[in-house]
């Protein structure tokens, strides 16, 4: 099996993506009535990076970006949710091979696939990883963390469905479709 190293492009994407993650978290979070749970417009951006660059970059941008934003904004990091954010980017990134964004293709089939995957990823991240991590690491009450997880799943799923789909459609629109260029006679 061939060892795959990270390319310079992917490392740069991780750094830029993490920095943008921090900025978006700082200035675009919308509070909800559920304690410590916000509507986060950063997650469609994470989905975009994961879909373009793949699972490693998706995980790293989510994990590093969330770590930095927690530390900068709160002075401490909530590791269970940081890991959940990384898992969200990882799962969306794993499915990116099925999307043909680099060839400018993001039609109904790809939109459906992307949204099925992102909903699944949100469920795993926010209803499994984050609450179980909260219970194990921080001894948080189960009823509280699962309500937070369900709220995060719904809000993040909807923001990625709407804004993430629009971002991916716009990105695919900037790419030249395979076979669209023809040699003139």
UniProtKB/Swiss-Prot annotation:
As for family, the record states: Belongs to the UPF0397 family.
Q: Kindly report the protein's main subcellular placement as a broad class.
A: membrane
Which Cys-Cys disulphide bridges does the record give?
none
- Keywords per UniProt: Cell membrane, Membrane, Transmembrane, Transmembrane helix
A single Pfam family, by name? Answer: ECF-ribofla_trS
The UniProt entry lists membrane topology as: Multi-pass membrane protein
| Species per Swiss-Prot/TrEMBL record | Lactobacillus helveticus (strain DPC 4571)
Which InterPro entries does the UniProt record give? ECF_substrate-spec-like, UPF0397
Q: Which GO terms describe its cellular component?
A: plasma membrane
At the top level, the lineage of the source is Bacteria
Sequence intervals crossing the membrane? 11-31, 45-65, 72-92, 111-131, 145-165
Output this protein's name. Answer: UPF0397 protein lhv_0999
Tell me the HAMAP family matching this sequence: UPF0397
Q: List where in the cell it is found.
A: Cell membrane
């Amino acid at each position: 099996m061939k060892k795959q190293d990270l390319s310079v492009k992917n490392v740069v994407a991780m750094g830029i993506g993490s920095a943008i993650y921090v900025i978006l978290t700082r200035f675009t979070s919308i509070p909800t009535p559920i304690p410590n749970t916000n509507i986060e417009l950063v997650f469609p951006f994470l989905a975009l990076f994961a879909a373009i660059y793949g699972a490693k970059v998706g995980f790293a941008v989510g994990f590093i970006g969330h770590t930095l934003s927690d530390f900068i904004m709160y002075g401490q990091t909530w590791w269970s949710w940081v890991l959940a954010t990384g898992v969200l980017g990882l799962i969306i990134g794993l499915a990116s091979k099925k999307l043909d964004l680099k060839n400018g293709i993001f039609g109904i089939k790809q939109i459906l696939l992307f949204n099925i995957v992102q909903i699944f990823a949100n469920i795993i991240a926010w209803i499994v990883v984050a609450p179980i991590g909260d219970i194990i690491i921080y001894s948080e009450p189960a009823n509280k963390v699962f309500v937070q997880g369900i709220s995060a799943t719904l809000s993040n799923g909807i923001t990625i469905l709407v804004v993430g789909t629009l971002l991916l459609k716009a990105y695919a629109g900037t790419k030249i479709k395979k076979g669209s260029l023809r040699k003139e006679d």
